[in-house]
């Protein structure tokens, strides 16, 4: 049986992400995606046998989209500037794509593709923090940084915190200042070009 020429795994995922961003009341079903793509629902089962596999694919694609956005924002920055750019880009993405960010927090994919993606997250965060901390401290430092970013996202969106963006700038500066100047931090940080594999707290 020939499948419609417009149907592909990438097209299905792209449609699903668009639906998540339009209405995140619940994850898009295969039937709803089929209607969006004007194909029979059965045709989608050739790519995704069930919703769990579909949700995992959406999460991987969405997380990669977020990571790409952060990488572009960070660019070739180094040191403290790199940390500032990462924080601001993270918040900018969560503000621009709130439904997708919620979906990523509710769906944690496993498998080789997800593991490779999580390693990319580890690399960008390790690159930002490695000038300041030794590997054994890195997981706790990264967790602290991530907790601030996620917490500010929650306060701004769910509590509708007044002047949240200004408060975030202050909190971000205070936390980064504290971490960079901590007694546990390295003294006289230098870039070595080496990347140490750091397991992230949320990695599969």
Question: Could you describe each region identified by the protein language model?
Answer:
Residues 20, 54-62, 104, 108, ...:
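Alpha-helical DNA-contacting segments of helix-turn-helix folds
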Residues 91-112, 154-162:
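Amphipathic alpha-helical segments used for helix-helix packing
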Residues 8-16, 33, 58-66, 70, ...:
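Generic hydrophobic, amphipathic alpha-helix propensity
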Residues 57, 71-99, 109, 118, ...:
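Hydrophobic alpha-helical connector segments
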Residues 108-144, 166-177:
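Amphipathic alpha-helical packing segments from all-alpha helical-bundle domains
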Residues 11, 15, 19-53, 57:
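Helix-turn-helix
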Residues 96, 146-164, 177-189:
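Amphipathic C-terminal alpha-helical segment
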Residues 1-7, 18, 183-204:
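N-terminal intrinsically disordered/low-complexity leader segments
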């Amino acid at each position: 049986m020939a499948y419609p020429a417009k149907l592909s795994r990438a097209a299905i995922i792209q449609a699903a992400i668009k639906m998540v961003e339009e209405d995140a009341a619940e994850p898009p079903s295969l039937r709803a995606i089929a209607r969006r793509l004007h194909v029979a629902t059965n045709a989608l089962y050739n790519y995704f046998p069930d919703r769990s596999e579909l949700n995992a694919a959406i999460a991987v694609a969405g997380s990669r989209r977020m990571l790409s956005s952060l990488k572009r924002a960070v660019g070739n920055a180094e040191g403290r500037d790199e940390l500032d750019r990462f924080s601001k880009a993270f918040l900018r993405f969560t503000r621009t794509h709130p439904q997708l960010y919620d979906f990523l927090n509710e769906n944690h994919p496993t498998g080789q593709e997800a593991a490779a993606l999580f390693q990319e997250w580890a690399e960008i965060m390790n690159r930002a923090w490695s000038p300041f901390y030794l590997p054994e401290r890195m997981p706790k430092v990264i967790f602290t940084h991530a907790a601030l970013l996620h917490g500010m996202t929650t306060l701004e969106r769910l509590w509708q915190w007044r002047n949240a963006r200004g408060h975030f700038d202050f909190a971000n500066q205070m936390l980064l200042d504290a971490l960079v100047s901590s007694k546990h931090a390295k003294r006289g940080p230098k870039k070595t070009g080496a990347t140490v594999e750091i397991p992230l707290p949320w990695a599969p």
